UniProtKB/Swiss-Prot annotation:
Keywords noted in UniProt: Host-virus interaction, Viral attachment to host cell, Viral tail fiber protein, Viral tail protein, Virion, Virus entry into host cell
Organism field: Enterobacteria phage K3
Keyword DNA-binding appears in the UniProt entry: no
UniProt subunit comment: The distal half-fiber contains two molecules each of Gp36 and Gp37 and one molecule of Gp35.
Protein name: Tail fiber protein p36
Cellular component terms (Gene Ontology): virus tail, fiber
InterPro entries for this protein: Tail_fibre_p36
Cell compartments where the protein resides: Virion
Amino acid sequence: MADLKVGSTTGGSVIWHQGNFPLNPAGDDVLYKSFKIYSEYNKPQATDNDFVSKANGGTKSQGFQKEVEFREGVKISATFSGGSDLNGLYSGNGDGASREKANMDLRSWYGIGIWNTCTGDGSGTHNSGLMPGVVHVETCWRLLFQTDNVISNASGPTGPAHLTRKDYVDGAINTVTANANSRVLRSGDTMTGNLTAPNFFSQNPASQPSHVPRFDQIVIKDSVQDFGYY
């Protein structure tokens, strides 16, 4: 029998023994040299391996630091009873022949809210909005803008259903024409011509020589006046 000693080899490799065996127990772990061996019992953790955890999520430095591609969309499951499991962001199929197939879909079980953290006059650095070339909004009830202003940067309206801009409305109602110049305002204007109307109603009786008298202040032509006996 061969005499085994430190440095003995077999097949050209050093024989492992208690002094050079690379596996060592460390509590419930097993180390290879100084490195932990993962097992079914001791599984790798997200913090140990630059993972984003399914259970714990990941934000800031623990979140994704580079672009992430999702081939079939991002599904956001409802966390309440009655919500749809189709919530999420999904890509279209690239078929430009039909809008519903080509568009990217932002899906919601009921509605989509756009929220920001602006304060004061709303001119902070947090902005929200839809900014493609065309925004088509369909609603069966109403479209509510709960903000100080709704701003349109486009030109003036061209159709009856178009939303108008303030400068367009101001220009339309403040335009001075020959007809507008011939009208009398509600107060403060003096006419230079005759005023003809079927009847004039005066709330107050005449009290100055230049006032037009009311019917109860005059004597009707050809009427009989009874002044009584003196």
